[in-house]
């Protein structure tokens, strides 16, 4: 398969046969998976081998990676800093060179946040294209309305490879739909329109981050892309954030 012989790790929240799946929750300390979850099966069928599982915060609900079962995962670039969360163990393992491929999950940044903190690649796919079956504490529960599963890696090419392995309907859905992801339809940066949103009063970032994002936009403009520093999506960020919080807690 496309991952023949590749060793990898995976977020603790995925089910691997005969291994603990606790989500960092003491109530599930002895929760042992009876079988591989769907994502794990697909990786195995593609040829991958699992070395182990990576750390998470309690119930996958934080932007750090500590729980009372496994302890704390720190950022391999600076052990006094956090790796992000909730896929913090995934990103830390990649950044440390311990693994070359990972899978995490994301609602409000749980793949993207640790990928950013640790300097690796992460992708939050469109909801539904990767089944959540097997990313669960209790089997056969309905999929979350907000959460998605997705890959982390050390390059964009590896993200695509992992996404191709993970994506597609589960068996119970396969009669109803199939996945046909389009290929990228541009050949050069000159064909791209880029909007740069470097900070916002609803979610301000540090000056260092704002400056670096602006530099990226300026570089893309020099390379021929059509770049706007003023364009914004047609919605109110404050309302969107409030609506998200209501959905998250519902």
Spans of features found by a protein language model:
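Gly/Ser-rich catalytic/binding loops embedded in alpha/beta enzyme cores
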Residues: 1-108, 218, 223
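Short beta-strands and strand-loop turn motifs
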Residues: 19-23, 52, 140-143, 195-199
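Amphipathic alpha-helical segments in well-structured domains
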Residues: 36, 120, 210-214
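Short, solvent-exposed alpha-helical surface patches in well-structured domains
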Residues: 42, 158-161, 211-212
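Generic structural signal for helix capping and beta-alpha/helix-loop junctions
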Residues: 58-60, 110-111, 204, 237
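Fold-level recognition of mixed alpha/beta catalytic cores in primary-metabolism enzymes, strongest
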Residues: 64, 70, 91-191, 195-197
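Short, basic, helix/turn surface patches
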Residues: 75-87, 127-137, 250
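Amidase signature
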Residues: 165-250
């Amino acid at each position: 398969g496309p991952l023949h012989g590749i060793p990898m790790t995976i977020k603790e929240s995925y089910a691997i046969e005969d291994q603990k799946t606790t989500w960092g929750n003491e109530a599930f300390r002895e929760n042992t998976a009876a079988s591989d979850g769907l994502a794990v099966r697909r990786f195995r069928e593609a040829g991958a081998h699992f070395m182990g599982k990576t750390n998470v915060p309690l119930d996958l609900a934080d932007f750090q990676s500590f729980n009372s079962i496994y302890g704390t995962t720190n950022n391999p670039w600076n052990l006094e800093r956090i790796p992000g969360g909730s896929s913090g163990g995934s990103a830390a393992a990649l950044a440390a060179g311990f693994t070359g491929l990972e899978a995490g999950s994301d609602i409000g940044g749980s793949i993207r946040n640790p990928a950013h903190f640790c300097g690796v690649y992460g992708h939050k796919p469109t909801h539904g294209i990767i089944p959540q079956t097997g990313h669960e504490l209790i089997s056969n529960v309905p999929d979350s309305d907000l959460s998605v599963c997705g890959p982390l890696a050390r390059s964009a090419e590896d993200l695509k490879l992992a996404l191709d392995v993970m994506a597609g309907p589960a068996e119970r859905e396969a009669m109803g739909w199939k996945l046909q992801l389009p290929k990228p339809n541009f050949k050069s940066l000159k064909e791209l329109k880029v909007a740069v949103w470097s900070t916002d009063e609803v979610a301000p970032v540090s000056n260092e981050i704002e400056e670096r994002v602006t530099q990226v936009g300026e570089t893309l403009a020099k390379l021929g892309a059509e770049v706007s520093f003023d364009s914004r999506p047609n919605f109110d960020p404050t309302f969107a954030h409030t609506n998200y919080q209501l959905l998250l807690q519902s």
